């Protein structure tokens, strides 16, 4: 259908919920694979990680320092309140890779890996490794909000956010890119 008058609000919300649930299930499978690779033999339940009913904020792209992925966690106490809110839960899914010769970009991923293990954020903040087109597809389709907070004026276009908006994802951005 190309005429939005033929799609009811209920159908639209049902579709958004379906693609978010698919993203959550995909992320759980990826996290299980990551864990088995890093700590084989360890049994961790991944079915409790991420909530299909929670507002899902995504950040998936090449990791470069100017893109400032971990910036939002500078307000750590506020983030903890958001993810712990039982009435309106929020969760974060990060994915990406640094350029092979970008050591600073590689180091920029480390705080996210450590944050996901923090007891107050566990299960609400995840990092999906081995970012590729398949991960990108799942993320741009399933996230509710796309995070974009690069250092101005360094973002040329912000295509990941453009793709996410085509799937009904809202942008949470500074005035750069997009």
Predicted segments, located by residue:
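Catalytic cores of carbohydrate-active enzymes across secretory and cytosolic contexts
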Residues: 1-178
């Amino acid at each position: 259908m190309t005429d939005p008058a033929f799609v009811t609000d209920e159908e639209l919300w049902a579709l958004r919920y379906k693609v978010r649930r698919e993203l959550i299930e995909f992320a759980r499978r990826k996290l299980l694979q990551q864990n088995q690779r890093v700590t084989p033999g360890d049994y961790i339940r991944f079915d409790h990680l991420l909530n299909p009913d929670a507002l899902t904020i995504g950040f998936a792209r090449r990791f470069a320092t100017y893109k400032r992925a971990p910036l939002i966690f500078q307000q750590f106490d506020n983030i903890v309140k958001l993810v712990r809110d039982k009435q309106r839960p929020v969760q974060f899914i990060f994915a990406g890779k640094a350029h092979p010769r970008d050591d600073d970009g590689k180091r920029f991923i480390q705080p996210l890996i450590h944050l996901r293990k923090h007891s107050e954020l566990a299960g609400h903040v995840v990092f999906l490794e081995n970012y590729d087109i398949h991960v990108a597809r799942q993320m741009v389709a399933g996230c509710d909000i796309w995070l974009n907070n690069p250092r101005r004026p360094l973002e040329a276009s912000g295509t990941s956010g453009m793709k996410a908006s085509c799937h009904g994802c809202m942008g949470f951005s500074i005035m750069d890119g997009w």
